[in-house]
């Protein structure tokens, strides 16, 4: 059980509720007896009775005299529609995410919906906890950004619970391979292709790639990077290719880039393809620290057209991300699913990437 500072009966209540919400226990399934639960968690029968009593009162459990306690069936959608929308993104206040959230928020508020915001910090345990919290609310729908979407979905039970509870949801930026729901995203592979194609056409052959591959966006951008090389019949310089995880994003790419730049001129890369603008801006400083300049000594490209992509002396060549528009369209899609009760007819929205050429790249 979690949250050790809570009273024991509330800790137990949360634990049993997680069994139900995650789909570990199904509707009409009998739960363990008071005696079994008390033994399992080393609690008094009174504490167990208190937790079960609250869950029964709230409609999560029901009793049959002489038979035991069972998991309730989901309430019909019409009984719980309070015009409340949950938004769960990897981040809320960082990078491009405020623009996405703002677009969704303004659209939903215009339609009279109340918002619940949560972030996962791209951590699967945090995603589990946030989904658990959201499902406890009387939600009309959810907008969700998957957490480490390339690494599978250990929280699948919660998504199945959303289906069982008839709560529609839309995913943004990526979609878990195991989940079937509408998605609003970029064509990340084509974006990676356009950036790399641009550099190859400028004459670059030793191109370093930095991709965060615990998210599908990074996997797809890497795929585009490789496809551009193949289309131009240019070998991928695998010794200049780096895959990294979310936890390494502030350290590993910078360390590796520094090592690349310290090589003799004839051995170092002539261009960097970065997973996003956030990384590209960090690498601009690494390049400067090595006494090199962009684009004279090395070209660099980012992804997303972040606000700061044009805030420095070097203006980044990048791919434009729809940001606010993505939030608006995700919200509009979800409202349609809620109000028209149509899920099967809703298709994905996939944005075609637009290459923005600025002064961070140069022909060689």
UniProtKB/Swiss-Prot annotation:
SUPFAM superfamilies: Periplasmic binding protein-like I, Winged helix' DNA-binding domain. CDD domains: PBP1_AraR (cd01541), WHTH_GntR (cd07377). The keyword Translocase does not apply. Residues 6-74 form the HTH gntR-type domain. GO terms for molecular function: DNA-binding transcription factor activity; transcription cis-regulatory region binding. Residues 34-53 bind DNA. It comes from the Bacteria. The keyword Cytoplasm applies. Its main location: cytoplasm. Keywords: Cytoplasm, DNA-binding, Repressor, Transcription, Transcription regulation. One of its GO terms (cellular component) is cytoplasm. It is found in: Cytoplasm. Pfam families: GntR, Peripla_BP_3. Transcriptional repressor of the arabinose utilization genes. This is Arabinose metabolism transcriptional repressor. It comes from Geobacillus stearothermophilus (Bacillus stearothermophilus). The gene is araR.
């Amino acid at each position: 059980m979690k949250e050790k500072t809570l009273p024991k009966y509330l800790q137990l209540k949360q634990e049993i509720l997680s069994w139900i919400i995650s789909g570990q226990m199904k509707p009409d399934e009998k739960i363990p007896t008071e005696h079994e639960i008390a033994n399992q968690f080393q609690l008094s029968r009174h504490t167990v009775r208190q937790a079960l009593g609250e869950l029964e009162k709230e409609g999560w459990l029901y009793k049959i005299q002489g038979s035991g306690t069972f998991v309730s069936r989901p309430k019909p959608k019409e009984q719980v529609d309070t015009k409340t929308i949950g938004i769960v993104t990897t981040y809320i206040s960082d990078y491009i995410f405020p623009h996405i959230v703002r677009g969704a928020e303004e659209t939903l508020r215009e339609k009279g919906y109340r918002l619940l915001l949560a972030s996962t910090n791209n951590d699967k345990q945090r995603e589990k906890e946030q989904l658990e919290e959201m499902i406890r609310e009387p939600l009309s729908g959810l907008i969700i950004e998957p957490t480490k979407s390339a690494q599978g979905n250990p929280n699948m039970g919660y998504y199945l619970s959303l289906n069982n509870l008839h709560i529609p949801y839309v995913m943004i930026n990526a979609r878990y391979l195991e989940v079937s729901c509408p998605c609003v995203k970029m064509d990340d592979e084509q974006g990676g292709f356009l950036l790399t194609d641009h550099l190859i056409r400028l004459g670059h052959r030793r191109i370093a790639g930095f991709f965060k591959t615990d998210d599908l966006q990074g996997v797809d951008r890497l795929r585009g990077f490789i496809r551009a090389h193949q289309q131009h019949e240019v070998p991928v310089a695998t010794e200049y290719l780096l895959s990294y995880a979310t936890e390494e994003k502030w350290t590993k790419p910078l360390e590796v880039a520094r090592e690349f730049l310290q090589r003799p001129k004839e051995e170092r890369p002539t261009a960097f393809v970065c997973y996003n603008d956030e990384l590209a801006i960090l690498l601009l400083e690494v390049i400067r620290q090595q006494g090199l300049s962009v684009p004279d000594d090395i070209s660099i490209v980012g992804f997303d057209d972040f606000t700061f992509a044009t805030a420095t002396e070097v203006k980044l060549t990048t791919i434009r991300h729809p940001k606010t528009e993505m939030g608006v369209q995700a919200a509009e899609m979800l409202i349609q699913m809620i109000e028209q009760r149509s899920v099967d007819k809703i298709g994905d929205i996939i944005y075609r990437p637009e290459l923005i050429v600025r002064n961070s790249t140069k022909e060689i």
